[in-house]
């Protein structure tokens, strides 16, 4: 179905810079996210008929409710999307709209960049559709403002068509998903549902309930700096220690060599001098045993290096970030079965595969609300080559409406 306000709503949202910032001491991590919630989303939520719309300054969540209009539809379903965008330029987003895409290259504004089907063969899936792209200078922000726009549009449709019967609906828009802390302060008591869905997936049909389990690893290397001319048997180069540590990790267990259910170690940052160096990693795996084994391995490498050095010069700090939500959701597959049924009725083929990443639903599921992930349409997310199909967004709205009407 076509929805008149969907495209304009999406364009309005992505033009607001809501980029999150790691290592911030505030929630949300940036003031722009709170401003987006309070000045744009909250008034709109109230205008389209959501009730009890309120913003929680402690956790940065904006929540609203649409009560059931049929008492026999007893389920309570939630829909969640995040307001922040990823670590890429998000200032002055200037979307361009490609009507009736017919294949070939798409020049991104006046930049020297282009979307080329040879580099991005996923473009070939969108012949004849309306695509929204960047101008080559920013990301687009479909992750996850497409999800916000889809939820808003579904609610607007339901309130404008009161004869359409639906269950109780809760809506939540939250901060800081991209930096991994968005759901840390989520309050289950303020979101009383049987289950929920994050509208945060990619192409048409995605339905996901398996995520990575994730940990952050910080390794500090303590060297000893002396003049290189007299360094023999005295200098300990912290940068060399960092290189040695990295080379002791399995070379093929890196993102660029893995897919499917394979986990990895990913070096995300390396800074330092001869005196001190610091390496930042993320650790990812699907199975609990292999996830734990990866953490044990880095501890063992550090212990072995320290033993060889005769003192503690390799310091490891490990922090779990989130866990594979499959462990929770597989205990009650109602949310998955309902979504599959709705998609199939809409002639959408469910694509059930693991998320090689995480969502807010990972943490929220472990808080007691099973929260799988549904497609929102974004492609090539987190950079200048990001795009989304309007038709896929429309289908996501169809799914949301189908879920609450079938509950």
Swiss-Prot record:
Protein location: Cytoplasm
InterPro entries (alphabetical): ArgE/DapE_CS, Bact_exopeptidase_dim_dom, Peptidase_M20, Peptidase_M20_dimer, Peptidase_M20B
Main location: cytoplasm
Positions with a binding annotation for Zn(2+) 1: 82, 143, 200
Residues annotated as transmembrane: none
Entries under Gene3D superfamilies matching the protein: 3.30.70.360, Zn peptidases
Reaction(s) the record says it catalyses: Release of the N-terminal residue from a tripeptide
Superkingdom, natural source: Bacteria
Pfam family, any one: M20_dimer
Cofactor note (record): Binds 2 Zn(2+) ions per subunit.
UniProt keyword list: Aminopeptidase, Cytoplasm, Hydrolase, Metal-binding, Metalloprotease, Protease, Zinc
Gene Ontology molecular function: metallopeptidase activity; tripeptide aminopeptidase activity; zinc ion binding
EC supergroup of this enzyme: hydrolase
Gene Ontology CC annotations of this record: cytosol
PANTHER family for this protein: PEPTIDASE T (PTHR42994:SF1)
Function: Cleaves the N-terminal amino acid of tripeptides.
Protein family (similarity comment): Belongs to the peptidase M20B family.
NCBIfam families reported in the protein's UniProt record: peptidase-T, PRK05469.1, PRK13381.1
Name by which UniProt lists this protein: Peptidase T
Organism per entry: Streptococcus pyogenes serotype M1
Top-level taxonomy: Bacteria, Bacillati, Bacillota, Bacilli, Lactobacillales
Gene: pepT
């Amino acid at each position: 179905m076509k929805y008149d306000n969907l495209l304009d709503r999406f364009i309005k949202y992505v033009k607001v810079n809501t980029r999150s910032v790691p290592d911030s001491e505030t929630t949300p991590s940036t003031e722009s996210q709170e401003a987006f919630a309070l000045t744009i989303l909250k008034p709109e939520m109230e205008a389209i008929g959501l009730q009890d719309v309120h913003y929680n300054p402690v956790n940065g969540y904006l929540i609203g409710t649409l009560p059931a209009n049929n008492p026999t539809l007893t389920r309570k379903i939630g829909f969640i999307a995040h307001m922040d965008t990823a670590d890429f330029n998000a200032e002055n987003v200037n979307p361009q709209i490609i009507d009736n895409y017919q294949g070939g290259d798409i020049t991104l504004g006046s930049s020297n960049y282009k979307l080329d089907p040879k580099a991005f063969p996923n473009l070939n899936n969108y012949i004849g559709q309306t695509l929204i792209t960047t101008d080559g200078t920013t990301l687009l922000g479909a992750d996850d403002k497409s999800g916000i726009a889809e939820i808003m549009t579904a609610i607007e449709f339901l309130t404008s068509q009161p004869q359409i019967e639906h269950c109780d609906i809760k809506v939540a828009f939250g901060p800081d998903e991209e930096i991994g802390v968005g759901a840390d302060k989520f309050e289950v008591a303020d979101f009383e549902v049987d289950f929920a869905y994050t509208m945060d997936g990619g192409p048409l049909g995605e339905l996901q309930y398996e995520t990575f389990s994730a940990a952050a690893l910080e390794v500090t290397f303590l060297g000893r700096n002396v003049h290189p001319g007299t360094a023999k048997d005295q200098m300990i180069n912290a940068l060399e220690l960092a290189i040695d540590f990295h080379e002791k990790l399995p070379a093929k267990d890196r993102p660029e060599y893995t897919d499917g259910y394979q986990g990895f170690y990913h070096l995300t940052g390396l800074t330092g001098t001869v005196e001190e160096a610091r390496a930042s990693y993320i650790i990812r795996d699907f199975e609990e045993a292999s996830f734990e084994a990866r953490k044990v391995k880095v501890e063992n490498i550090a212990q072995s290096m320290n033993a060889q050095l005769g003192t503690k010069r390799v310091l490891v700090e490990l922090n779990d970030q989130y866990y594979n939500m499959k462990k929770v959701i597989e205990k009650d597959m109602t949310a998955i079965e309902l979504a599959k049924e709705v998609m199939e009725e809409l002639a959408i083929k469910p694509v059930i595969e693991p998320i090689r990443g995480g969502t807010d639903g990972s943490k929220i599921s472990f808080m007691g609300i099973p929260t799988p992930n549904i497609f929102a349409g974004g492609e090539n997310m987190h950079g200048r080559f990001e795009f989304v199909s309007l038709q896929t967004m429309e289908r996501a709205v169809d799914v949301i409406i189908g879920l609450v009407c079938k509950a």
